[in-house]
C-alpha cells in the first residue's frame, strides 16, 4: 500500500523544527545539562553551567535563539519505499521549510552560495540533506 504525503506537510514541519531547535533544548539534553550542573565541582564551571541554563530559560520564554549562531540546517531523512510525495519536490519542500523557519523565527542567516565568493543566500538555504530509503511507509 502506497502512503501519500503532500510536501506542504513537510514544509510546515521543517519550519517548526527550525524554530523549535533554535529556541529549546530537547528533554534529554536539558536533563543532561541539569545533571552536569549538579555534578560540577568547580565553582567557575558551576557558574558557567548556571548561566547556560539561565540563557535557555530566557530563550524559551522570550522566543529568542539559544545562540546567535543558529548554524546550518542538516537533515537525515529516512523515506519508506512505500511513500509517495505529492504536490511538489521533497527537496524543494525541505528548503522552503528552512527558508520560512529562519525568516519567521528571526534566525541568523549565515549560509553562502559559494564559499569562495561568500555571497549570503539570506535565507539559510540550501539545507544539507542526507537521504536513506528504508522499507515500509
Stretches found by the model and what they are:
Residues 1-137:
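Non-transmembrane, aqueous-exposed alpha-helical and coiled segments at domain scale
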Amino acid at each position: 500500500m502506497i502512503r501519500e504525503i503532500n510536501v506542504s506537510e513537510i514544509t510546515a514541519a521543517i519550519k517548526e523544527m527550525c524554530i523549535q531547535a533554535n529556541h529549546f533544548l530537547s528533554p534529554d539534553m536539558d536533563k543532561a545539562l541539569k545533571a552536569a550542573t549538579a555534578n560540577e565541582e568547580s565553582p567557575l564551571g558551576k557558574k558557567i553551567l548556571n548561566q547556560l541554563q539561565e540563557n535557555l530559560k530566557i530563550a524559551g520564554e522570550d522566543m529568542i535563539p539559544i545562540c546567535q549562531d543558529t548554524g546550518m540546517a542538516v537533515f537525515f531523512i529516512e523515506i519508506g519505499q512505500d511513500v509517495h510525495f505529492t504536490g511538489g519536490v521533497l527537496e524543494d519542500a525541505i528548503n522552503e521549510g528552512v527558508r520560512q523557519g529562519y525568516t519567521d523565527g528571526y534566525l541568523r542567516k549565515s549560509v553562502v552560495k559559494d564559499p569562495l565568493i561568500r555571497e549570503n543566500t539570506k535565507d539559510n538555504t540550501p539545507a544539507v540533506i542526507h537521504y536513506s530509503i528504508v522499507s515500509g511507509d
